[in-house]
Regions:
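Non-core capping and flanking segments associated with repeat-based/extracellular domains
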Residues: 1-259
């Protein structure tokens, strides 16, 4: 627009067409924290926000930074665990290198398990080192998938939460990115190099869903039985039934129980 070349961020955002933009991209250069906060405060219909080569102050924070449907933050050194926990119904989130630790990611996954709402569909975080599943999934029920290469892992939301449309989370590390995919048990999933017409039977993750629910029931039953000398016979029979169901799923599925 004429006359806007040397305008301040406030001058730009004072123009109604920019305040109503659904898509905003910051390309190269750097931006001050106050200016970035101003954009987030004034952009009322923002659905797609991108930092593309733009340097962001390490102390930047804003409550709306992760309440946007689609996000690409190439400079993500400012991102904290608390930011990730504010995601709700995002579809696509991509972050560059962060200062997040394994402990942060583990807390993030535990929060996802117990979240009342779906947080995201796809989340990508740049991380060069391969993941250590024993640390990343510490104290979380998980399955290790053999159907994919490189290794992939599954966790599930708590069964007491009924409003989650996508209760399954697939986690993997490929091409220097830590990737999280949330979806329903009936989602049909194909790799890029897989032929969706190669089989008449559609592949879903129903078996993985069922196996994780059984693991959850077993964990709750074991906790109930802890420290009891004379175990309830009904509980013991129930545990045996769950073992049989789980073994059947393990025999037919391409996954193992994560340890």
């Amino acid at each position: 627009m004429n006359g806007m070349k040397n305008a301040s961020v406030k001058d730009v955002m004072d123009v109604q067409i920019f305040r109503n933009c659904e898509n905003i991209a910051l390309v190269k250069g750097e931006i001050e924290s106050d200016d970035l906060r101003l954009v987030l405060d004034m952009a009322k219909n923002l659905k797609n926000f991108r930092f593309l080569g733009t340097r962001v102050p390490s102390d930047f924070q804003h409550e709306k930074a992760f309440s946007i449907e689609r996000i690409i933050y190439e400079d993500a050194n400012w991102v904290r665990l608390e930011n990730l926990l504010t995601m709700r119904n995002s579809t696509y989130v991509t972050l560059g290198t962060t200062s997040l630790t394994y402990s942060d990611f583990n807390k993030f996954l535990k929060f996802w398990v117990n979240s009342e709402a779906d947080m995201f569909m796809e989340l990508y975080i740049k991380m060069e080192e391969n993941i250590n599943p024993q640390v990343l999934f510490d104290r979380l029920l998980r399955l290790d998938l053999a159907r994919f290469n490189p290794p992939s892992y599954f966790i599930i939301s708590d069964s007491t939460i009924v409003d989650r449309k996508n209760p399954l989370l697939l986690v993997e590390h490929t091409n220097g990115m830590l990737k999280f995919f949330a979806f329903s048990r009936t989602r049909v999933w194909f790799r890029v190099n897989e032929d969706p017409n190669s089989s008449t039977e559609k592949k879903t993750f129903q078996s993985e869903f069922d196996a994780l629910r059984i693991l959850e029931k077993q964990a709750k039953l074991r906790k109930k039985m802890e420290g009891i000398e004379n175990l309830d016979q009904d509980d013991m029979r129930r545990m045996e039934e769950l073992d049989m169901q789980l073994n059947g799923l393990l025999a037919e599925g391409k996954f193992i129980i994560g340890e």
